[in-house]
């Protein structure tokens, strides 16, 4: 895919800064007025006007830097809408919110989704196995991600992507990192425009259709729910028709998911995670090491020494990994009756982190791993699996030799006279 010149989020932020100034505060106290819902959300006539100015400045900049006719952009965004609902959905949960791993897992690793996944695998086995051959990502993991994301296209979102991104780019909820998040979504809006321009080939109808495609409340699109920037960087033309279509082409979706994981460090033939030994003796160490940071800080050898892992998990020939392989402690809490969370701990490996890069959530990554296992994925080193195959083959060969030897040594009785 040919990339057009891009403008960085920082540059956009600086260029738009002139439009974000606010009026000086009044010298006298304002009259007490009833606060509307719009004002609570920061959406007043003044802020709406400022957001519109910022949006118009952005599309002018994108037009100039990428050679896209401004008329194309004005036509494509003429009917855009501000989505207050999206702001509510993307806002962080209240501080009293309790994470619930068991409930989260049950939404994905469940019979209906598994049945749909098995059908998807059967219908797309050739593409899945080809993607695995090229990238080293097991086909069950690829299928699990698409199943978790959209149930293979059944749930690709209920919002128009241009409305989502234009809302969050200029009116993100009031959070400490609001400015950084708005810059991120302005970059995604810019990437969407460039993506649709490349797809449209100067056809306004195609451009508009691309802008209007369904998305999640965060602006992710297609069967694998890629953000526009990820489509530009990681998506693949899996069916070879010269077009990347994550909405309608299953092969494109399959190869794109596999390529994303490969680029983000997937290690072919290696496991995703290990179960831990959670006892009264090891529990304090698990709590200490589970810092919530998606960084591989410890070696498997260290975790074995801490008593957190079984010794065989540091042995490639026993289904484990190299002792010096890096890992992290993953905490998966669920509420309990006594208000104290019950926490399940696993050890995440490099492949776990690759999935976290797809969606920055431990719950998500572990759900994908367990979903893939439900589809037949063997969460152990391929060296162990190959050793098992070789052993079975060797046992079979030895058995045949033994049978042949017995036949050879068997005395033939003379026929009766």
Which ranges hold each PLM region?
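Amphipathic alpha-helical interface segments
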Residues: 216-222, 227-230
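Bacterial N-terminal signal peptides
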Residues: 7-17
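DNA breakage-rejoining catalytic core of tyrosine-based enzymes
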Residues: 184
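Short glycine-rich loop/turn motifs that provide flexible caps or phosphate-binding loops at active sites
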Residues: 8, 146, 152, 218-221
């Amino acid at each position: 895919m040919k990339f057009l010149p891009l403008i960085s989020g920082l540059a956009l932020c600086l260029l738009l800064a002139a439009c974000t100034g606010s009026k000086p505060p009044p010298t006298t106290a304002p009259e007490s007025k009833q606060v509307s819902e719009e004002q609570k959300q920061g959406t007043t006539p003044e802020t709406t006007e400022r957001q519109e100015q910022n949006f118009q400045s952005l599309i002018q900049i994108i037009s100039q830097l990428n050679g896209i006719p401004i008329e194309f952009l004005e036509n494509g965004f003429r009917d855009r809408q501000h989505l207050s609902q999206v702001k509510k959905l993307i806002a962080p949960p209240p501080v009293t919110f309790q994470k619930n791993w068991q409930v989260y897992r049950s939404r994905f690793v469940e019979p209906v989704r598994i049945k749909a996944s098995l059908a998807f695998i059967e219908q797309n086995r050739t593409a899945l196995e080809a993607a695995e051959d090229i990238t080293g990502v097991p086909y069950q993991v690829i299928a699990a991600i698409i199943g978790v994301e959209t149930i293979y296209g059944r749930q690709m979102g209920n919002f128009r992507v241009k409305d989502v991104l234009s809302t969050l780019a200029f009116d993100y909820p009031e959070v400490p990192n609001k400015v950084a998040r708005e810059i991120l979504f302005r970059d995604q809006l810019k990437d969407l425009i460039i993506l649709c321009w490349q797809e449209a080939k100067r056809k306004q109808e195609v451009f508009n259709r691309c802008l209007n495609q369904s998305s999640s409340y965060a602006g992710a699109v297609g069967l694998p729910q890629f953000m526009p920037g990820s489509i530009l960087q990681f998506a693949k033309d899996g069916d070879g028709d010269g077009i990347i279509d994550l909405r309608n082409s299953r092969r494109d979706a399959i190869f794109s998911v596999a390529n994303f994981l490969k680029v983000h460090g997937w290690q072919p033939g290696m496991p995703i995670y290990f179960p831990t030994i959670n006892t009264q003796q090891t529990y304090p160490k698990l709590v200490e090491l589970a810092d919530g940071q998606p960084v591989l800080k410890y070696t498997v050898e260290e975790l074995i020494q801490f008593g957190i892992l079984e010794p065989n998990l540091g042995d490639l020939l026993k289904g484990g990994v190299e002792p010096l392989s890096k890992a992290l402690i993953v905490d998966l809490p669920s509420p309990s009756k006594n208000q104290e969370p019950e926490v399940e701990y696993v050890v995440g490996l490099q492949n776990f982190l690759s999935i976290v890069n797809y969606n920055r959530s431990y719950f998500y990554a572990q759900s994908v791993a367990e979903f893939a296992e439900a589809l037949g994925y063997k969460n152990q080193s391929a060296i162990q699996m190959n050793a098992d195959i070789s052993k079975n083959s060797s046992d079979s060969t030895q058995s045949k030799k033994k049978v042949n030897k017995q036949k050879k040594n068997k005395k033939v009785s003379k026929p009766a006279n």
